[in-house]
Amino acid sequence: ISGHRATYGGGIYLDQASIYIKEGGIINDNQATKGGAIYTEGTKAGSCLLNIEGGTISGNCANESGAGIFAICSKGTRDDMKVEISGGMIAHNYSGTGENLEENAIVLMGEDPNLTEDTGFADLYLSGSPVITGSVTLADDYCAADSKNYSPLIYVHNSFNVNKPILISPIHG
């Protein structure tokens, strides 16, 4: 999947559905405002699963955020948006413009002004030996105002092999 442009999900827009990316899958040279390669959303009306077992996500751009993957759970529960990565490569994807350009692999987000411990967020599950370069951003528009500081979670399975340290960065508000 290459050379596409969109507001959300330059290569793939996934809404309340599941997709599996296997060895040989290539998503490159796509552009969007959010989710240069992939934009995926789960809600309480329907869950979403992005499962990456292989393939390459590279050379994608996002004007705002999530050049590789932008995953959001909108007013759902904890299990409504999962990103599972066990293989493949996510590298050389860039968000922003000019001097604000940065390598950004994944943005995980929740969107619900009524935060509780059951509030849904896009959560990341890591296992195997994927290559991920650039930042992984945990974001939420409502967390800063809430003293409980709920946020997206990253689950790391004991089979996860770190090829290179992954930069985790929070964004609130």
Regions found by a protein language model. Give the residues of each.
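N-terminal accessory interaction module
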Residues: 172-173
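Surface-exposed loop/turn motifs in large extracellular/passenger domains
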Residues: 2-5, 12-31, 39-61, 69-95, ...
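Glycine- and aromatic-rich loop/turn segments at beta-sheet edges
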Residues: 97-98, 102-103
